[in-house]
A protein has these predicted regions:
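Core dinuclear metal-dependent hydrolase active-site scaffold
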Residues: 1-88, 154-238, 296-316
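Catalytic metal-binding/acid-base residues of hydrolase active sites
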Residues: 9, 29-31, 99, 125, ...
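Metallo-beta-lactamase
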Residues: 89-101, 242-246
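Active-site HxH/HxHxD metal-binding segment of metal-dependent hydrolases
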Residues: 92, 100-149, 263
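Extracytoplasmic/secreted cell-surface and envelope-processing proteins
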Residues: 101-105, 127-131, 135, 191, ...
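Short, surface-exposed basic-aromatic patches at helix termini and helix-loop junctions that form
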Residues: 107-116, 234-235, 258-261, 282-284
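Short acidic, glycine/proline-enriched helix-loop-strand junctions
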Residues: 127-158, 261, 276-298
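Internal alpha/beta domain cores that form substrate/cofactor-binding pockets in large enzymes
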Residues: 239-304, 308-312
Length: 316
């Protein structure tokens, strides 16, 4: 069993291989272009070298980081899947929420004959600003998957408290399956979130159990979501590994939730971010705060005997 947190730059992609052999992918990002927020932060952090490069027409890529003195190798999630799981379908693709940095390159799955069997989505009527052809292609593929012509893939819009065969139940109804628990969204608060216009708070917050390792995947959930989880779960919010919400930004950090979760490892997908970076706050509650940008791909493996390891692509 394995959970891989891929170094995809600004965005997310988590690939989980369950004991059943089924494959879950949570979000995908195969775009090497920086979004506006990250672009501004890179300029601030690296100064003139990045700022001058960013003025070149069409240059908004992670090549900026190399030019500014940071050597980084991003992982193409499509190539990762083809190399590590050749010929294998994605049994369960979960779109945490409908922001482009969590779905860029989605159309490349179909282009490389990687089929999605079940497509998890959230209820919304959000449409992002589409500023380039790559964004348009990814969004159009997302809409195609949501429509699910002829039932392929099967579209599921789950919420807190739901149960179902394969993801948290065995075919005979016994609890288990692939060990996925939905902590959020909650149907009681979904309308309020939709009305607020804060798409980040539509995020699936999932607790996935691999062997006995409890992993919380928090999407881009912000304070209001964490308030609800703290109120509803209390000390039952415990986990071993947390994938930090909103790429480790302050907006996704919640002090009481961290105290209750008390993870051994916190994984941040992006890395150090001036002004908005909450890594120092996470370290108050977790000794091991690992960024994919500095550590590369981060992989948790475990087996039925209870043996577990967590390793990174780069030892730094």
């Amino acid at each position: 069993m394995r959970a891989s947190f891929l170094n995809v730059g600004h965005g997310d992609c988590t690939v989980i291989e369950h004991a059943s052999g089924r494959l879950t992918v949570v979000d995908v990002n195969n775009c090497l272009e920086l979004d506006d927020e990250t672009l501004a932060e890179v300029r601030e952090y690296y100064g003139d070298s990045a700022s001058k490069l960013a003025e070149v027409p069409g240059v908004r890529t992670f090549g900026m980081l190399k030019e500014a003195g940071y050597n980084i190798e991003l992982t193409n999630p499509i190539e990762f899947l083809r190399k590590n799981y050749p010929g294998k379908d994605i049994f369960r693709y979960i779109q945490s929420h409908p922001h482009l940095d969590h779905m860029n390159g989605l159309e490349q799955l179909k282009a490389h004959n990687i089929e999605i069997v079940n497509f998890w989505d959230t209820e919304h009527d959000f449409t992002p600003e589409l500023t380039n052809d790559a964004d348009l292609a990814s969004w159009n593929e997302y809409k195609r998957l949501r429509r699910s012509v002829n039932g392929s893939p099967k579209v599921l819009r789950h919420s807190y408290g739901a149960s179902g065969t394969f993801w948290n139940q065995e075919p005979d109804g016994v609890k288990g399956g692939d060990g996925i628990e939905i902590l959020h969204p909650n149907r009681l608060t979904l309308k309020k979130i939709q009305d607020s216009g804060n798409v980040n708070n539509l995020s699936y917050v999932l607790r996935v159990i691999l062997c006995e390792v409890k992993i919380i995947l928090a999407g881009d959930a912000e304070k209001e979501v964490w308030d609800d989880l703290v109120s509803g779960y209390g000390d039952k919010l415990k986990c071993d590994v947390l994938k930090a919400s909103h790429h480790g930004r302050d907006s996704g950090f919640h002090e009481k939730a961290m105290e209750l979760m008390n993870p051994q490892f916190t994984i941040v997908s992006v890395g150090r971010k001036p002004e908005t970076d909450a890594s120092g706050r996470y370290r108050k509650y977790c000794k091991n705060v690992w960024s994919t940008r500095w550590k590369g791909n981060i992989v948790i493996t475990c087996d039925v005997s209870g043996h577990r390891t967590i390793k990174s692509q780069y030892d730094r």
